């Protein structure tokens, strides 16, 4: 597996710096983006459900990098125990240097089927209005006017990715939606027929297979963005 690619699956990570400042409601640009993303959660289906071939995607705002703790098993352990008793300027001087981001970032992470450019074209064509509203406060997005410039912008913000969503393989989105549908329907079938005698169970199973059509991806299935 190379960076970003595993078979026919692609893992995309974009980190897009957000401009400082506020909108017309005096809300910081990063917070305005966060509020809009929260509003997507209230929709029956996310705008990203319209984008072709998306297995799973996530947006979030990265405010800063976090220092979780001091290094273990060293002299800093002892010093950190007595730091609360020290004057403030001594405490700050004793702490290790911390890195911080110069901007807040809009992070977009997606696992999808296929190649990068057709996928980004699909995002733009199916959700251009939503994409503009989310990214408009990011540095560099002012130059995006069509699918081609959106692809160029995304490539400038892209980070190599080697970790994929473990709940998915590299089959087509239609095949994976079908598999989820069959799994759900078979669980329901097993629950409803567990007390049937053998002859009736066999007949019920044949009816189940005829209705579900497990080998037909174009037959009954889940829809993209569907909640179980």
Predicted regions and their residues:
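Short S/T/G/P-rich N-terminal loop/turn motif that feeds into the first structured element of a domain
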Residues: 1-94, 100-105, 111-114, 150-228
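An amphipathic, aromatic/His-enriched active-site/gating alpha helix that lines ligand/cofactor pockets
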Residues: 45-46, 99, 113-148
């Amino acid at each position: 597996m190379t960076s970003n690619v595993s078979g026919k699956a692609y893992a995309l990570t974009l980190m897009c710096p957000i401009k400082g400042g506020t909108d017309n409601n005096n809300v910081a640009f990063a917070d305005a983006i966060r509020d809009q993303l929260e509003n997507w959660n209230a929709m029956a289906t996310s705008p990203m459900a319209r984008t072709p071939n998306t297995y799973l995607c996530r947006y979030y705002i990265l405010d800063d990098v976090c220092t979780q703790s001091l290094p273990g098993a060293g002299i800093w352990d002892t010093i950190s125990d007595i730091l609360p008793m020290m004057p403030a300027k001594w405490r700050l001087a004793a702490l290790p240097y911390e890195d911080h981001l110069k901007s807040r970032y809009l992070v977009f992470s997606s696992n999808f089927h296929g190649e990068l450019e057709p996928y980004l074209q699909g995002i733009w064509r199916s959700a251009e209005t939503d994409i503009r509203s989310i990214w408009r406060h990011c540095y560099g997005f002012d130059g995006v006017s069509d699918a081609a410039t959106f692809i160029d912008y995304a490539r400038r913000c892209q980070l190599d990715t080697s970790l994929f969503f473990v709940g998915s393989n590299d089959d087509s989105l239609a095949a994976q939606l079908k598999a989820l549908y069959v799994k759900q329907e078979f669980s329901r079938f097993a629950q409803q027929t567990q007390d049937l005698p053998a002859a009736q169970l066999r007949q019920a199973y044949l009816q189940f297979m005829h209705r579900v059509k497990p080998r037909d991806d174009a037959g009954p299935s889940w829809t993209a963005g569907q909640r179980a």
